[in-house]
């Protein structure tokens, strides 16, 4: 079963439950991609979209005969697009195409009438890219408590203290960057102070199963169809494989339940409604996105040593080769540039110092982050990188010491 997990697993037992009412559902079969051709799976299936109690949107496909859910993908706004494949002779083949990366899922309509096909397509895109606000569907679970409960030290500290480094990074990603500059607006001690006083994050394991990411502009296209007839099933369609791109990882962590019914969606809602203020003292902010342009990064990324250090951070997968080209595509994508600009603005707010402590950054970098000095932060990180001995140097030194001990 192909399952894409959330980056932030719920910390509240039972909060991953879902409402029994689907946002959209229609009968449709799967199609398998083999090489550049898609062929229909004759099983009876059901495509449905549901919003779970943690406010996440799931795109699912299940076998109507066995009841087995084979695909359960967590989709975020602007991750993907559901559209008809015009090259298919039957006109009833649709593809869930992810905007960042090469992943595509094909389906063929099994509803007896065709008059609702386009309406189903419209509803799918509406639910995936404009999901309903939490609580508007009347689902039980997270809507029962108020956001103000997050202001208490016990709730927030329990929530944040049990996050892994990768999970904390989500807070400075596009989904949660809206309000890092206004952290002081939280009631109680504030998120920044809680980050500084919270314990080390729990251990976590991650995998790259989430289908979409802030990665690279896709270049995929669908070519003309070629027929391979099947009874009551669409003809197979030929598709040109796009250049693969990274997909963001999803993390799972093992953590104790907080003392209050705290949901991460509440925290993200607070962060998303805050505004990043101007730099301290009215000083001019440094926009990292305008500094780290593709032209400037090109000669750096051409360095084999740099490529070797960056390759391990690319997501792994069957259709996601870890190549130097993928590094180039990722770092020059509009999504990455947008995330870089948002991180730059949040860093300039002077509120990220405690968060930087969580990552074990040098004191100079933490101090610069507390001051909102982006330039000083960059210099501190550069100096720290220069001071760290290279792996080869460390090995040579160790060998030399062993030789001396033998003498």
Swiss-Prot record:
Question: Where on the chain is Phosphothreonine found, per UniProt?
Answer: 217
Tell me which residues make up the Pru domain. 18-131
Q: For this UniProt entry, what is the primary localization, expressed as one broad class? A: cytoplasm
Its Gene Ontology biological processes?
adipose tissue development; follicle-stimulating hormone signaling pathway; oogenesis; ovarian follicle development; positive regulation of growth hormone receptor signaling pathway; proteasome assembly; regulation of T cell differentiation in thymus; seminiferous tubule development
Signal peptide location:
none
GO MF annotation, one: endopeptidase activator activity
- GO CC annotation: cytoplasm; nucleus; proteasome complex; proteasome regulatory particle, lid subcomplex
Q: Does the keyword Ubl conjugation apply?
A: yes
Query: Which region ranges are annotated with the description Interaction with UCHL5?
Result: 362-407
Residues with the N-acetylthreonine modification = 2
Which positions bear Phosphoserine?
A: 15, 140, 211, 405
For bias kind Basic and acidic residues, which ranges apply?
Answer: 387-398
Query: Residue ranges of region Disordered?
Result: 130-150, 196-259, 381-407
Q: Where is the composition biased (Low complexity)?
A: 137-150, 196-248
Post-translational modification here is noted as:
Ubiquitinated by UBE3C in response to proteotoxic stress.
Covalent crosslink: Glycyl lysine isopeptide (Lys-Gly) (interchain with G-Cter in ubiquitin)? 34
Q: Tell me the InterPro entries matching this sequence.
A: DEUBAD_dom (IPR044867), Rpn13/ADRM1 (IPR006773), Rpn13/ADRM1_Pru (IPR044868), Rpn13/ADRM1_Pru_sf (IPR038633), RPN13_DEUBAD (IPR032368), RPN13_DEUBAD_sf (IPR038108)
* Annotated compartments: Cytoplasm; Nucleus
How does the entry describe the domains? The Pru (pleckstrin-like receptor for ubiquitin) domain mediates interactions with PSMD1 and ubiquitin. Preferential binding to the proximal subunit of 'Lys-48'-linked diubiquitin allows UCHL5 access to the distal subunit.
Subunit organization? Component of the 19S proteasome regulatory particle complex. The 26S proteasome consists of a 20S core particle (CP) and two 19S regulatory subunits (RP). Interacts with the proteasomal scaffolding protein PSMD1. Interacts with deubiquitinase UCHL5; this interaction activates the auto-inhibited UCHL5 by deoligomerizing it. Interacts with UBQLN2 and ubiquitin.
Q: Which family does it belong to?
A: Belongs to the ADRM1 family.
What the protein does comes down to:
Component of the 26S proteasome, a multiprotein complex involved in the ATP-dependent degradation of ubiquitinated proteins. This complex plays a key role in the maintenance of protein homeostasis by removing misfolded or damaged proteins, which could impair cellular functions, and by removing proteins whose functions are no longer required. Therefore, the proteasome participates in numerous cellular processes, including cell cycle progression, apoptosis, or DNA damage repair. Within the complex, functions as a proteasomal ubiquitin receptor.
- Protein name, entry field: Proteasomal ubiquitin receptor ADRM1
Organism for this UniProt entry:
Rattus norvegicus
Name of encoding gene: Adrm1
């Amino acid at each position: 079963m192909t399952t894409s997990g959330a980056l932030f697993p719920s910390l509240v037992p039972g909060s991953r439950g879902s409402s029994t009412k689907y946002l959209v559902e229609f009968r449709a079969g799967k199609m398998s991609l083999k090489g550049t051709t898609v062929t229909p799976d004759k099983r009876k299936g059901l495509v449905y979209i549901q919003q779970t109690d943690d406010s996440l949107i799931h795109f699912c496909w299940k076998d109507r005969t066995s009841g087995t859910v084979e695909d359960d993908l967590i989709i975020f706004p602007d991750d993907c697009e559901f559209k008809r494949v015009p090259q298919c002779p039957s006109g009833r083949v649709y593809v869930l195409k992810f905007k960042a990366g090469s992943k595509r899922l094909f389906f063929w309509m099994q509803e007896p009438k065709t008059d609702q096909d386009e309406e189903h397509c419209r509803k799918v895109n509406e639910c995936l890219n404009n999901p309903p606000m939490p609580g508007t569907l009347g689902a039980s679970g997270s809507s029962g408590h108020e956001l103000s409960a997050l202001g208490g030290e016990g709730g927030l500290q329990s929530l944040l203290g049990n996050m892994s480094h990768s999970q904390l990074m989500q807070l400075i990603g596009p989904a949660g960057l809206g309000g890092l500059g206004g952290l002081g607006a939280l009631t109680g001690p504030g998120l920044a102070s809680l980050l500084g006083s919270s314990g080390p994050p729990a251990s976590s394991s991650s995998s790259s199963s989430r289908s979409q990411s802030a990665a690279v502009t896709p270049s995929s296209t669908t070519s003309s169809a070629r027929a391979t007839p099947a009874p009551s099933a669409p003809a197979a369609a030929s598709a040109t494989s796009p250049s693969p791109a990274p997909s963001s990882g999803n993390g799972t962590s093992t953590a104790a339940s907080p003392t209050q019914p705290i949901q991460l969606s509440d925290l993200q809602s607070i962060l998303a409604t805050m505004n990043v203020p101007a730099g301290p003292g009215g000083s001019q902010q440094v926009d990292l996105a305008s500094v780290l342009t593709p032209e400037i990064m090109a000669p750096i990324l051409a360095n084999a040593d740099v490529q070797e250090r960056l390759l391990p951070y690319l997501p792994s997968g069957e259709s996601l080769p870890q190549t130097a080209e993928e590094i180039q595509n990722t770092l020059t994508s509009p999504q990455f540039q947008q995330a870089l600009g948002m991180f730059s603005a949040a860093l300039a707010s002077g509120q990220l110092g405690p968060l930087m402590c969580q990552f074990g950054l040098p004191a100079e970098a933490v101090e610069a982050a507390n001051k909102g000095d982006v330039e000083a932060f960059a210099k501190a990180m550069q100096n720290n990188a220069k001071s760290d001995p290279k792996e080869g140097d460390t090995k040579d030194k160790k060998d030399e010491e062993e030789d001396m001990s033998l003498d």
